[in-house]
């Protein structure tokens, strides 16, 4: 029951890289954040609990699981893992001179861009919820307990003494862009009455396959019947995505998390106020757009929230 299950997981991609390294020239396996840290410290082989989660790191044992070596991993490739906010060292003097930075600058273990976005846009308290409406739809809820179920694509990141529970659906802006231009979406949205139902029961996907709230690579899009009225079609798509969002939060709630009384929205879809009203009607909770939505803002908060 681990998030590494599946051919598109980080673990699967890492195994492919290892297979391609036929001469075994690699010394470390790195995420992008690890690569940046290695350059700032002039020392590789370090990572954080969030970036390594989908690679297989065991948050309960605070160690790499035994089974990971049976997949083909060599122990020397796996990074030493630190909690988010752990002090990793001082900025390398050579790098400090090159970048014009203070040589006393501290380097801390970071997080994923999605988690940093959550920290940027939401208050760090139990029950805080953020939906990201980008090319895909991602939901995250801060919880006191770890919640995970690989059967539906649900997992938890560790942030301090709490857990950031979430999952990502394949629905989202990529579906809208398949049928409409950005200007069409803006103009047609103005013609939609968000208080009324479209009467359409859609499961909007751009392609076959879903990750969350059901982990089903064979899941087919449900976009029938297709009305001739483009406004009605868009209405149905927006409602379908709102229903997937609701189902996502319900799945977290059923497994012990909080159902949000307020959802912060980030991403391009947060600008569509008609969609926001449709979501409020269907999910039956308060929804508003995030003020600080840049992941860099969340990353800057890490030393103050979790630093040691």
Protein language model annotation of sequence segments:
Residues 1-4, 9-32, 37-43, 54-72, ...:
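Active-site core segments that coordinate phosphate-bearing ligands/cofactors
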Residues 60, 84-87:
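Short beta-strand to alpha-helix junction loop
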Residues 45-51:
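Helix-loop-beta segment of a Rossmann-like dinucleotide-binding subdomain
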């Amino acid at each position: 029951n681990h998030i590494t299950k599946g051919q598109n997981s980080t673990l699967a991609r890492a195994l492919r890289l290892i297979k391609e390294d036929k001469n075994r020239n690699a010394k470390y396996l790195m995420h992008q954040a690890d690569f940046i840290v290695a350059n700032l410290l002039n020392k590789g082989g370090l990572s954080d609990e969030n970036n390594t989660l989908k690679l297989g790191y065991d948050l309960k044992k605070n160690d790499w699981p035994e089974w990971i070596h049976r997949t083909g991993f060599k122990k020397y490739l796996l990074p030493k893992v630190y909690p988010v906010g752990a002090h990793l060292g001082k900025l390398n003097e050579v790098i400090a001179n090159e970048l014009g930075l203070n040589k006393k600058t501290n380097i801390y273990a970071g997080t994923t861009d999605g988690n940093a976005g959550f920290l940027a846009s939401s208050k760090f308290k139990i029950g805080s919820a953020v939906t990201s409406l980008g090319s895909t739809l991602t939901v995250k809820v801060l919880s006191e307990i770890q919640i995970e179920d690989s059967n539906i694509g649900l997992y938890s990141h560790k942030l301090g003494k709490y857990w950031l529970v979430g999952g990502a659906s394949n629905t989202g802006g990529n579906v809208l862009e398949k049928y409409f231009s950005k200007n069409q979406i803006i103009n047609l949205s103005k013609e939609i009455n968000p208080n009324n139902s479209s009467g359409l029961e859609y499961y909007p996907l751009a392609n076959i396959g879903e990750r969350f709230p059901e982990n089903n690579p064979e899941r087919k899009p449900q976009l029938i019947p297709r009305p001739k009225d483009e406004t009605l079609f868009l209405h149905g798509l927006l409602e379908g995505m709102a229903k997937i969002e609701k189902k996502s939060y319900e799945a977290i709630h059923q497994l012990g998390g909080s159902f949000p009384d307020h959802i912060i929205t980030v991403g391009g879809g947060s600008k569509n106020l008609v969609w926001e009203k449709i979501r409020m009607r269907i999910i039956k909770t308060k929804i508003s757009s995030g003020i600080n939505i840049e992941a860099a803002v969340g990353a800057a908060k890490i030393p103050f929230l979790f630093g040691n």
